[in-house]
UniProtKB/Swiss-Prot annotation:
<dbReference type="GO" id="GO:0005198">
    <property type="term" value="F:structural molecule activity"/>
</dbReference>
<comment type="similarity">
    <text>Belongs to the bacterial flagellin family.</text>
</comment>
<dbReference type="InterPro" id="IPR001029">
    <property type="entry name" value="Flagellin_N"/>
</dbReference>
<dbReference type="GO" id="GO:0009288">
    <property type="term" value="C:bacterial-type flagellum"/>
</dbReference>
<dbReference type="InterPro" id="IPR046358">
    <property type="entry name" value="Flagellin_C"/>
</dbReference>
<dbReference type="Pfam" id="PF08884">
    <property type="entry name" value="Flagellin_D3"/>
</dbReference>
<dbReference type="Pfam" id="PF00700">
    <property type="entry name" value="Flagellin_C"/>
</dbReference>
<dbReference type="InterPro" id="IPR042187">
    <property type="entry name" value="Flagellin_C_sub2"/>
</dbReference>
<keyword id="KW-0975">Bacterial flagellum</keyword>
<dbReference type="InterPro" id="IPR014981">
    <property type="entry name" value="Flagellin_D3"/>
</dbReference>
<protein>
    <recommendedName>
        <fullName>Flagellin</fullName>
    </recommendedName>
</protein>
<dbReference type="GO" id="GO:0048018">
    <property type="term" value="F:receptor ligand activity"/>
</dbReference>
<keyword id="KW-0964">Secreted</keyword>
<comment type="function">
    <text>Flagellin is the subunit protein which polymerizes to form the filaments of bacterial flagella.</text>
</comment>
<dbReference type="InterPro" id="IPR049365">
    <property type="entry name" value="FLIC_barrel"/>
</dbReference>
<dbReference type="GO" id="GO:0005615">
    <property type="term" value="C:extracellular space"/>
</dbReference>
<dbReference type="Pfam" id="PF00669">
    <property type="entry name" value="Flagellin_N"/>
</dbReference>
Amino acid sequence: MAQVINTNSLSLLTQNNLNKSQSALGTAIERLSSGLRINSAKDDAAGQAIANRFTANIKGLTQASRNANDGISIAQTTEGALNEINNNLQRVRELAVQSANSTNSQSDLDSIQAEITQRLNEIDRVSGQTQFNGVKVLAQDNTLTIQVGANDGETIDIDLKQINSQTLGLDTLNVQQKYKVSDTAATVTGYADTTIALDNSTFKASATGLGGTDQKIDGDLKFDDTTGKYYAKVTVTGGTGKDGYYEVSVDKTNGEVTLAGGATSPLTGGLPATATEDVKNVQVANADLTEAKAALTAAGVTGTASVVKMSYTDNNGKTIDGGLAVKVGDDYYSATQNKDGSISINTTKYTADDGTSKTALNKLGGADGKTEVVSIGGKTYAASKAEGHNFKAQPDLAEAAATTTENPLQKIDAALAQVDTLRSDLGAVQNRFNSAITNLGNTVNNLTSARSRIEDSDYATEVSNMSRAQILQQAGTSVLAQANQVPQNVLSLLR
């Protein structure tokens, strides 16, 4: 080897090896400090790609496991609501069994039907209001797709069904029996303006009253809506201490006013606070059907209208007072008598399917013949259910039963079977979700282990590599110092 000064090849060789050991030491320290064998693609390009795919799968499967747990929660929420519906159905069945006993009177059946109706209403409420995260789970047929995998198409479906009294076939369930309906002409009396003026009129009290002296009404009669009594402020001619408010009687045939009960002294407490209605003129008034006829005409009902007194007779011969009604042909419309003797037909206000506010006339009918019902869109509903109902927002409303339900227990059993079927499906899908969660957990564990073998550092190997690199660094540094001294040997030739 030539002795040269310009180029120190030994030093260059040593520097190169020192750089290599420095790089190896840096790599070992990086892997030991991060815990990863692959810190960038340069460490292992193929391994980095494989590990990245594993990471995507692991993250996706972990989220899928959470999705499956959400699916279990939805199924549990739905089944909980179905359990409550089932409880109501069991009570309805119990009531139906009770109603089948011939010892029940018709009023007993009315009471039983009242609870059945309330139970069915509660079923409808549970159906319409039960929700999970804003999703109404029993309000309509629906399929919820739960993503339980890391890739497209890896799903489990939850099939939900609309469960209410209508879909269960119980919306017209009725155990009542039809009453025998009868009517009689109604005598309606009211109070209207007449020529019999009572202002400042004088009248004779009974002999047991104020001793036959003249009394004079000073002002208007007062009427108490609460008690149905009349009161008047009376001035007694020639009397002392007898002036004041008295209860008076009004003869409905001629409007004659007399002291009530032979009163001899005015009311101790004065005029009752509830006596607020002014009555200046009194007359027996015949039923005024003007308002009722206008309502019938507006509803498209034609025919002669008359006011009747309704009565209902059950199978045991018991008669129930049905109040007033307006009769047109064979139809009866529930009616109310106003203070002035006018008759108005009871109505139900609702929102139509086009969003407009409308009014329907209350008709007497239903399975018992005396329930107030309304006809809307060709369907018949109980007036109590249709009152205030929004058919645009909620088009489905249970119709009123027109007849007594045949084989009610069979219908209820079919409804229970329908609920049981859906509950079974929900129970099965919960078990399926549990199985999916277990499988997802196992898969995540296996993929995590596989990714670890690819990208995690082997500390035994890396510590050994670091130690080797450190030793090489120390040795290289020492040798480099010696290699740098080689050109100095050439100087000895120049001495």
